[in-house]
A protein has these predicted regions:
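Bacterial Sec-dependent signal peptides at the C-terminal "C-region" and cleavage site
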Residues: 7-18
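Histidine-rich, glycine-flanked metal-binding segment
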Residues: 17, 26, 30-70
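Histidine-centered divalent metal-coordination motifs
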Residues: 23, 67, 74-81, 220, ...
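Divalent-metal coordination cores built from histidine and acidic residues
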Residues: 68-69, 73-76, 90-217, 250-297
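Histidine/acidic-residue-rich catalytic or RNA/ligand-binding cores of hydrolases
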Residues: 84-86, 116, 227-234, 268-285, ...
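His/Asp/Glu-enriched, well-ordered alpha-helical/loop segment
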Residues: 212, 299-306, 311-398
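C-terminal cap of metal-dependent C-N hydrolases
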Residues: 389-429
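Beta-rich carbohydrate-recognition modules and glycan-binding surfaces
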Residues: 433-604
Length: 604
């Protein structure tokens, strides 16, 4: 049975008498040599560390002879809603992959503000097992990286000036994010024309607001000049490697003065054409990941483009120089980007560090205490010491001496509670998607009854469009309870703009519309329109959709569910797995299309 179906059984109960881990090689996360010791856990904290600790009544004893106890690993750069090999999102499997690799803290850059509350609700309740999530809200500049995928300003909030940054941060902080991600650097690696970048005053305005709220700022920074901008603005970390030029003394001095750390995400830049996998590493991958890599390894090697070879050499040298210069360096991977797999990539990143000038102990410290410090949480977690949070894992062997032993995870603890790893492994090996909480639909979707801009379902309507900097733009307002949409089409050959009405907050959890016959609404407009159903476990390009027409006057449109079609002939419409309804406006490049909508509802 999938771990998610078991709820809190995937996270063991708090032991009333505590947990005593005996005779482990304890790597405390600081980089100091591991030593034999016992560790006593009480509640969610480490109570004591030492030799010969006494076992009080009711304590659970774990014999850790031959094993190493470590603080949980961090991944400071993930996209948990992306699986790393294409396909629909499966948060439960992404979370599971991190836990089985000993990653107890993951920073997620793949969410929008509306997603934070429902994700926290289902993970903190135990409905879906997860590491300690640090959910980030994204900011960027118009025409910059992060804004070109067609996901809308709600997903990457745009801030071209310090004043706009203040407004964007007002919106962002209302969602209580754990971190702020800023797409500050527009270099696209020389493959395509550069995008726009953020200036120092705007970035500094974001940093000041975030730090006042106790929140770290991590930037998408990939160039030497962009790194100087970020360090001058006082960001907590550069969230990628500098790949265009060798770092200079000026940057090192700026980073040391501002306390800006370096999270180079070497795993995403490592040329994949000739990369190899250790047997233990390959064994721990999910079946589709393993199949992809085995198929690649069975083929003749593809050539590595000269651009990638040159960038990789620069990244390696910059990692060495920044380490030698005394800059703090943490672990992040960009997990979820093609071929950078959830969970396993964090261990691979640690291994890569040991190939480029780090000892095993230094690389492990980067993944534990240093990364916790980058998140401004070093006083609370990231080390094995009395008073620290008990996010820990046990590994067979001595990874502080032989880094490959890091794949031999035996036990994982989150806040002092042991994680059941076997159900998580079964979940990863299953073809099924993780069960998520579902909400029964009552009928109304957006009838105009609310006056706060939200739908009847208390969700926020948002605009999306085709990818590209020259994309379409949708503006919508409410007039007399109706939604009025006006789209200015972009320069793409087949431009479109869409209004997304989430059926649950952030379209994360599921909507159950079983028992209804279809969707009805009132519409007026003379353009080309379609209604699509965003569904769990289906790729966006394959969402079920039905075309519809409008007219010069408002009229009711009813679309039965059996009229919706998918581009994937194998796809099946599951009315218990809906997430959003999407009204799509299509037109000619540079044209304008409008649509008026009202009384949107499921009908029986």
């Amino acid at each position: 049975m999938a771990c998610a179906l078991l709820g809190l059984l995937c996270l063991g109960a708090v032991q009333p008498g505590g947990i005593l881990i005996r005779s482990a090689h304890v790597f405390d996360g600081t980089g100091a040599p591991a030593g034999l010791a016992d560790v006593l856990i009480s509640g969610d904290r480490i109570e004591a560390v030492g030799r010969g600790l006494r076992a009080r009544r009711g304590v659970r004893i774990i014999d850790a002879r031959g094993m190493t106890l470590m603080p949980g690993l961090h991944d400071l750069h993930t996209h948990l809603r992306s699986p790393g090999l294409g396909g629909p999102d499966d948060l439960g499997k992404a979370y599971a992959a991190h836990l089985i690799h000993g990653v107890t803290t993951a920073v997620d850059f793949s969410v929008s503000g509306e997603m934070l509350a429902p994700i926290r609700e289902m993970t903190e309740s135990g409905a879906v097992s997860a590491p300690r999530l640090q959910l980030a809200i994204r900011l960027g500049v118009p025409g910059g990286h992060g804004t070109e995928r067609g996901w809308g300003d709600f997903f990457t909030m745009e801030a071209p000036t310090p004043a706009a940054a203040e407004l964007a941060m007002n919106r962002a902080l209302a969602y209580r994010p754990d971190a702020i991600k800023v797409f500050a650097d527009g270099w696209r690696y020389g493959r395509v024309p550069d995008l726009n970048s953020m200036n120092v005053p705007t970035l500094r305005a974001i940093v000041v607001r975030a730090h006042a709220a106790g929140i770290p700022v991590i930037t998408h920074t990939v160039t030497l000049e962009g790194a100087k901008v970020a360090a001058s603005a006082g960001v907590d970390a550069l969230g990628h490697g500098i790949g265009d030029a060798i770092v200079d003394d000026e940057l090192i001095a700026l980073m040391r003065a501002s306390g800006t750390a370096y999270v180079p995400t070497m795993a995403v830049y490592e040329p994949q054409q000739d990369r190899s996998f250790l047997p233990a590493e390959l064994r721990l991958l999910a079946p589709p990941e393993r199949a992809r890599e085995e198929a690649r390894l069975a083929r003749p090697l593809d050539p590595i483009p000269e651009l990638e070879t040159r960038r990789w050499a620069i990244l390696i040298e910059n990692l060495r120089r920044l380490k030698a210069g005394g800059v703090r360096i943490g672990i992040g991977t960009d997990a979820g980007i093609g071929g950078v797999y959830q969970g396993s990539s964090a261990v691979r990143e640690v291994r890569l560090f040991t190939q480029f000038g780090f000892t095993s102990a230094q690389a492990l410290a980067a993944a534990t205490s240093v990364s916790a410090g980058i998140l401004r949480q070093g006083a609370d977690r990231g080390r094995i010491a009395a008073g620290q949070r008990a996010d820990l894992f046990l590994v067979a062997g001595r990874p502080d001496r032989r880094i490959e032993d890091l794949y031999e995870v035996r036990r994982v603890f989150l806040a002092g509670r042991e994680v059941a790893l076997a159900p998580l492994r079964r979940l990863l090996d299953s073809d099924e998607f993780t069960p998520l909480p579902a909400h029964r639909m009552a009928g109304p979707i957006d009838t105009g009854a609310r006056t706060d801009g939200r739908t009847d379902l208390d969700t926020l309507p948002v605009a999306t469009n085709e990818a590209g900097i020259d994309h379409s733009r949708l503006h919508f307002t409410r007039e007399g309870g109706r939604l009025v949409l006006v789209a200015r089409m972009g320069a793409a050959a087949r431009p479109f703009a869409s209004l997304v009405l989430p059926l649950t907050r952030g379209a994360v959890q599921l909507a159950d519309a079983r028992g209804f016959a279809g969707i009805a609404f009132e519409a007026r407009g003379t353009g080309r329109y379609a209604l699509a159903l965003e569904s769990y476990a289906i790729n966006a390009r394959d969402f079920f959709r039905a075309d519809f027409g409008g007219g010069t006057t408002m009229r009711e449109v009813r679309i039965p569910f059996d009229q919706f079609r998918s581009a994937d002939p194998a796809a099946r419409l599951d009315l218990a797995r809906l997430r959003a309804v999407i009204f799509r406006l299509e037109g000619e490049p540079g044209g304008q299309v409008s649509l008026e909508l009202g009384n949107i509802r499921f009908y029986r």
